[in-house]
Amino acid sequence: MLLNACCKKNLWPRNGSTIFRRFALKLRPYQEECLSACLNAFDEGKRRIAVSLATGSGKTALFPHFIKYAPTLRPNSEQCLILVHRKELALQALKHCRESLPNKSIEIDMGNQCASGLADVTVASVFSLKNERLLKYNPLNFKLLIFDEVHHMASPSYLRILEHFGAESEKSKVNVIGLTATLFRADGKGLACGLDEIVYHRHFVDMIKDNWLVEPKVINIKWSTDLVLADSSSFLDQEKLKKEAQSEKAIFEIPRAWLEHASNRSSTLVFCINVEHSLKVCNAFRKLGIDARALFGETNDSERETLIQDFRKKKFPVLVNCMVLTEGTDIPNIDCLMIARPTSSPNLLTQMIGRGLRLHEGKRDCLILDFCDSLRRVSLHVDPTLAGLSPDEVENFYNKSKNSLANPDYDPKIYGLQSVLWYSKLRKLIEMMDNIKNKDRSIFNLSTNAWVAVGMGRYVLSFLQKVLIIDTNFEDGTHKISEYTKEKLGTRVYNRKRIVSDRIPSLKFAIRAAETYISNLKTPRSLISRKAVWRMRPASVRQINFLKKSNLKLDEKLLTAGVAADMITKVIYGGKGRQVRTDKLQSYLKHDANLKRITTLKELKG
């Protein structure tokens, strides 16, 4: 449940002048609203709450205030633990706490730096806290756990810490706050295992509108790399994509685009596919006389710190990185981003874009050179959610895994990202039918399993005595996964229904979540793969007879068992309920509220 940003009650005066003057930084209005929402939730008895705040909104600045005002649940339980997963996040949290809480003892527990477990405030690495290192923290002495970048919470490392502090359920014995800019996961895992309610949300588009973030200006760059490969789940396609992206032609297109569009920008951050790609792109910049440096995971700590500090001081104009500067690093002078790393994840794309949106003196906007058509391919209007599969349903999750947005006169260089996103949202309302058809065709790129698009936003996968169905919600574009299991009661066979997951933001995520669930059932690949041997064999007599009864025209000699199985699935799950779903869609598109939205669309286009 998402609370309104305007809280039901305030625990202090709106201006906060007397409350916050002891702190190093005064909170912005939305930060005050967020803090009020969290404390009100604790006051109402909620113990595990979530906050969704845009990248660059100053989440870390809230930590000292949470520590100061969070209620104690037991006598003498005043200690607080801040949990992060990256060194940069730990150092930021440490800096804010030391500046704003000078009278508190503050320690860090990460890598070779070991804390006593007795400090008033400890900033710790999630991955360092295990075995004896976790046991030194006495749960009875703690009032608050703060999880930064909490969208990682579904992993076992986080759940282990929650269990140690007695916070594994809504009857938690300690207050828990989880913060992130992206409160959803691309792998289908839910966050409800550690959090119970989203009490505050502020999207980065809202932050741009209110001038708390700079406006992005987007230019789509035509890249020679085949971006269709980026949407494929095939390992071979992903390898082919990496190879194409590292061709000499594709590599040099990146610095040439910078020279054409961004040579007047002071600080450009480039996102690349992997380390090899980063090094080649960096060398291409340097061959064209541009001072570029490369940063990736293997860069040692001292060199990394020097690179980032020099980049902050604008000593060189281009920093090329691979999966390092996506979370937590505060470099507000970045005024240009180059996205040369295809992604279908709203999480990752939001984090990448957020690197360039922070306010900075003399910075009017952030130019985004998008080589991957990211803003057309990935929806960033995704509401925060705790929904998804529980961790025990996803422990065996696999490790590997164009159409025009608007009218042809639309120019993202003029209108910027805010207009792109809003226009995309409206477009979905009046072209729901077309979008569903596009998704039906793209199902083959999203999975190698034999999903069948039966029409009107429904996708079906049959195996053993089970059927998984993904249905599209026409009102908000989310997806629901249902499982039907054939069971026998006496002589009667019936289907038992179970909702596996709901309100999944995209079809790709729904497919991933469903296949995560299937893998946990240890379903043989030979039953569900689109390339299974049995699907290539001739259709059985039983299949042919069923289809004949359905009055379908058949070429029995050419009909394979796989094609016949798909046709049967369409007959059973497509026809039944199709009219109901059609009526729902038509009703939604004709609703008065949406007519207003369509009117707004026409005005925007005009």
Swiss-Prot record:
<dbReference type="InterPro" id="IPR050742">
    <property type="entry name" value="Helicase_Restrict-Modif_Enz"/>
</dbReference>
<comment type="similarity">
    <text>Belongs to the helicase family. IRC3 subfamily.</text>
</comment>
<feature type="binding site">
    <location>
        <begin position="53"/>
        <end position="60"/>
    </location>
    <ligand>
        <name>ATP</name>
    </ligand>
</feature>
<dbReference type="GO" id="GO:0032042">
    <property type="term" value="P:mitochondrial DNA metabolic process"/>
</dbReference>
<feature type="domain" description="Helicase ATP-binding">
    <location>
        <begin position="40"/>
        <end position="201"/>
    </location>
</feature>
<dbReference type="InterPro" id="IPR027417">
    <property type="entry name" value="P-loop_NTPase"/>
</dbReference>
<protein>
    <recommendedName>
        <fullName>Putative mitochondrial ATP-dependent helicase irc3</fullName>
        <ecNumber>3.6.4.-</ecNumber>
    </recommendedName>
</protein>
<keyword id="KW-0547">Nucleotide-binding</keyword>
<dbReference type="InterPro" id="IPR001650">
    <property type="entry name" value="Helicase_C-like"/>
</dbReference>
<dbReference type="GO" id="GO:0003677">
    <property type="term" value="F:DNA binding"/>
</dbReference>
<dbReference type="GO" id="GO:0005759">
    <property type="term" value="C:mitochondrial matrix"/>
</dbReference>
<keyword id="KW-0496">Mitochondrion</keyword>
<keyword id="KW-0347">Helicase</keyword>
<dbReference type="Pfam" id="PF04851">
    <property type="entry name" value="ResIII"/>
</dbReference>
<dbReference type="GO" id="GO:0005737">
    <property type="term" value="C:cytoplasm"/>
</dbReference>
<keyword id="KW-0067">ATP-binding</keyword>
<dbReference type="InterPro" id="IPR014001">
    <property type="entry name" value="Helicase_ATP-bd"/>
</dbReference>
<dbReference type="GO" id="GO:0004386">
    <property type="term" value="F:helicase activity"/>
</dbReference>
<keyword id="KW-0378">Hydrolase</keyword>
<dbReference type="InterPro" id="IPR006935">
    <property type="entry name" value="Helicase/UvrB_N"/>
</dbReference>
<feature type="short sequence motif" description="DEAH box">
    <location>
        <begin position="148"/>
        <end position="151"/>
    </location>
</feature>
<feature type="domain" description="Helicase C-terminal">
    <location>
        <begin position="246"/>
        <end position="398"/>
    </location>
</feature>
<dbReference type="GO" id="GO:0005524">
    <property type="term" value="F:ATP binding"/>
</dbReference>
<dbReference type="GO" id="GO:0016887">
    <property type="term" value="F:ATP hydrolysis activity"/>
</dbReference>
<dbReference type="Pfam" id="PF00271">
    <property type="entry name" value="Helicase_C"/>
</dbReference>
